[in-house]
Curated annotation (Swiss-Prot):
Protein name as it appears in the record: Aspartate carbamoyltransferase catalytic subunit
GO terms, molecular function: amino acid binding; aspartate carbamoyltransferase activity
Substrates-to-products reaction catalysed: carbamoyl phosphate + L-aspartate = N-carbamoyl-L-aspartate + phosphate + H(+)
High-level lineage: Bacteria, Bacillati, Cyanobacteriota, Cyanophyceae, Synechococcales
Cross-referenced Gene3D superfamilies: Aspartate/ornithine carbamoyltransferase
One cellular component (GO) term of this entry: cytosol
Cysteines engaged in disulfide bonds, as pairs: none
Keywords per UniProt: Pyrimidine biosynthesis, Transferase
Entry function: Catalyzes the condensation of carbamoyl phosphate and aspartate to form carbamoyl aspartate and inorganic phosphate, the committed step in the de novo pyrimidine nucleotide biosynthesis pathway.
Family: Belongs to the aspartate/ornithine carbamoyltransferase superfamily. ATCase family.
UniProt key word Transferase: yes
Amino acid sequence: MGNWPHKHILTLSNFSIDDYESVIELTERFKSLNNAGTKKIPALQGKLITSIFFEASTRTRNSFELAAKRLSADVQSFSPSSSSLSKGETLIDTALTYAAMGSDILVIRHSSSHVPLEISKKLDASKAKTSVLNAGDGLHSHPSQGLLDLYTLIKFFSPKLLKPEILNSKKILIVGDVIHSRVARSNLWALTAFGANIILCGPPTLIPEEFTDFVSSSPPNQLRDPISSRGSITISSSLEESIKCADAVIVLRLQKERMIENLLSSIKSYSENYCLTPEKLSLNCKDIPILHPGPINRGIEISSRVVDEYPNCLINDQVSNGIPTRMALLYLLSKFNN
C-alpha cells in the first residue's frame, strides 16, 4: 500500500473511491487479525496518539484508544476539567502544546462544527507534523462512523468477496433526527459514493431540503467504474411507506441536547410515527439489516424487540467493526508522506 494522500481526516467530502477502498481493505485485514486472536501488532510502535474529547463519548473514545493500543501506539487522554483550559488557555494553544510534546495524531471531538479543521490549520501554519482525526464535530461530520457503517453494510451484503459496488442501487433508509446528525452527513458521502440511493425519513422539521445537495457537490474523482454515477437522495415523511422498499435501515436518535427550537409536537407523537418496531419492519418482505450509531433510546426511535430479537440488527457489529476501522484510519495517517 502506497502513501496516504491526506494529512488530516476531517470529513469524507474529499475522499476518492481509492481512499474508501484503502480503508475498507485495511479494516478487513485488521478485523481478520483480531478474529484470529492477534490483539496487538507493532504497526504504530513509537507513535503517540492523543485523544481530545470535549463531548461525552463511550463508543468512539474507547474505540479509538483501543484501536491505537492494538497498533502498539502510546496513548494519552485529554481531560478538559483538569487541563490548563480551566486557567484560560485556548483550545488552539492546547493542541499546539500536544503537538510540541510529540503527538503524531490528535483525535478530536467537539460540540462545535469545524473545530478540528481550525486546529489542523493552526498546526499546519506552525509547521507541525501532527495529524488531526475528526472524531465528531458538532453537526458537521463523523468520518470514522461513516466509514464503519459503510464497511458494516458491505460486509453484510457481500460477506466473502467484500465488494463495495454491491451497494450500487441499494436503497438505504436513514430515519430520525437527520438535521442534527453528523453521522447522517458522513453516511451520505460514503454511501452515495458507491451508488446507494438514500431515503431520508422523518418529520419535515428534522430533515432540511438542502441535503439533496450532497450528491451534486461531490468531487469528480469520486466516480470510477464499475460505478457509473453517484446515488440519489430522496426525502420522505412516512416511515411505513419508506420501509417497504428499503434494503437497509440506519436509525438515528433524537438529539434533544441540540434542539434549540421546538421542532416536535411531542416525543410520544414522534415515537408513534418514527419508532422502528417489528410491526413496521413487517411491511418489508426482506430480512433487512438495521444499524444505529448509538447511543440508542429504546422505545423512542427503536423498540427493544428490534434491538434484542431482530436477527439482522447490526448494532453490536457496528461497535465491533469500529475498532478495526479506526485502526485503519490511524495506520493510514501514519503513512502520510512516509
